[in-house]
């Protein structure tokens, strides 16, 4: 009871992608996973103030590509790319492999769930009232174009002795809709009285599948139907679409096809139509 599925894991392979893209045998899997954890920990520890949201890792044969998503790329890159080179050499020494470091800028930090959670946590650590911090974060995200947002803070809120949880939300956050683009992030605020957990869900709209472009024109489809094409080529849906089109459009389209490309039935039918018109 009360268990919630992870919003990003629930949508993997549908509208979300994996943050680690590699395959390893059973023998090397533990080693690769340990390297991933080392890389992520080293990057987050070195760039504490760089507003890093996510670290994506891809592996080739003898090369590891690390993509860092950050809202402050200038801090990560440094003057003339100096800090990037230093970080790349450090990561190569850490795992003993060649590392390619890519920096990806986040244009709107207010729509990134982890960065929103991190901003709320930093305000709580500076002794700002948690309700005020949550309301400001919600207002900024909605102003930036979010369709909905929910923030949950749990712990010794306000310094009380008994820990509790408080939730604030605005707009829609459809957790069970797979096409809904929901970003999720969580972090901790370290206070003198203990840790306060912050969870954020940001609904950024729906991701709809792109409309499939029709590879064949109405003329080709009509010719395939009349030539008794296989069922794999002409489906019931295509036949229904062709039948629904006006006869004038079909006749005009048939007339534009060269005679040598038409099936015999189409050629005969076109000749009959021409005779009738005469």
Curated annotation (Swiss-Prot):
Family matches, as SUPFAM superfamilies: Prokaryotic type KH domain (KH-domain type II), Ribosomal protein S3 C-terminal domain
Database matches in Pfam families: KH_2, Ribosomal_S3_C
Region (Disordered): 255-278
Keyword Transcription regulation: no
Any one Gene Ontology cellular component term annotated for this protein: cytosolic small ribosomal subunit
GO biological process, one term: translation
Record PROSITE patterns: KH_TYPE_2, RIBOSOMAL_S3
Domain KH type-2 residue range list: 39-107
Signal peptide: none
Superkingdom assignment: Bacteria
Classification via CDD domains: KH-II_30S_S3
Gene3D superfamilies per the UniProt record, alphabetical: 3.30.300.20, Ribosomal protein S3, C-terminal domain
Subunit-structure text: Part of the 30S ribosomal subunit. Forms a tight complex with proteins S10 and S14.
Family, as annotated: Belongs to the universal ribosomal protein uS3 family.
Protein name (database record): Small ribosomal subunit protein uS3
Organism, as annotated: Dehalococcoides mccartyi (strain ATCC BAA-2100 / JCM 16839 / KCTC 5957 / BAV1)
């Amino acid at each position: 009871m009360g268990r919630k599925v992870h919003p990003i894991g629930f949508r993997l392979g549908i509208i979300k992608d994996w943050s680690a893209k590699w395959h390893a045998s059973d023998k090397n899997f533990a080693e690769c996973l340990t390297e991933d954890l080392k890389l992520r920990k080293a990057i987050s520890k070195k760039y504490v103030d760089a507003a890093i949201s996510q670290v994506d890792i891809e592996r080739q044969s003898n090369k590891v590509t690390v993509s860092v998503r950050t809202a402050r790329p200038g801090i990560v890159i440094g003057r003339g790319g100096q800090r990037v080179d230093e970080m790349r050499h450090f990561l190569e020494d850490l795992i003993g492999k060649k590392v390619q470091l890519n920096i990806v800028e986040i244009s709107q930090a207010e729509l990134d769930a982890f960065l929103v959670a991190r901003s709320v946590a930093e305000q709580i650590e500076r002794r700002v009232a948690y309700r005020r911090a949550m309301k400001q974060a919600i207002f900024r995200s909605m102003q930036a174009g979010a369709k909905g947002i929910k923030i949950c803070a749990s712990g010794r809120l306000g310094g009380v002795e008994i820990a509790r949880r408080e939730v604030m939300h605005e707009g829609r956050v459809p957790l069970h809709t797979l096409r809904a683009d929901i970003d999720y992030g969580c972090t901790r605020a370290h206070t003198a009285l203990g840790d306060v957990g912050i969870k954020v869900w940001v609904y950024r709209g729906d991701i709809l599948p792109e409309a499939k472009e029709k590879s064949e024109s109405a003329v080709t489809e009509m010719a395939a139907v009349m030539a008794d094409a296989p069922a794999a080529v002409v489906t019931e849906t295509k036949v229904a679409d062709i039948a629904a089109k006006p006869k004038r459009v079909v006749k005009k389209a048939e007339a534009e096809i060269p005679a040598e490309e038409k099936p015999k039935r189409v050629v005969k039918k076109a000749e009959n139509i021409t005779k009738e018109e005469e």
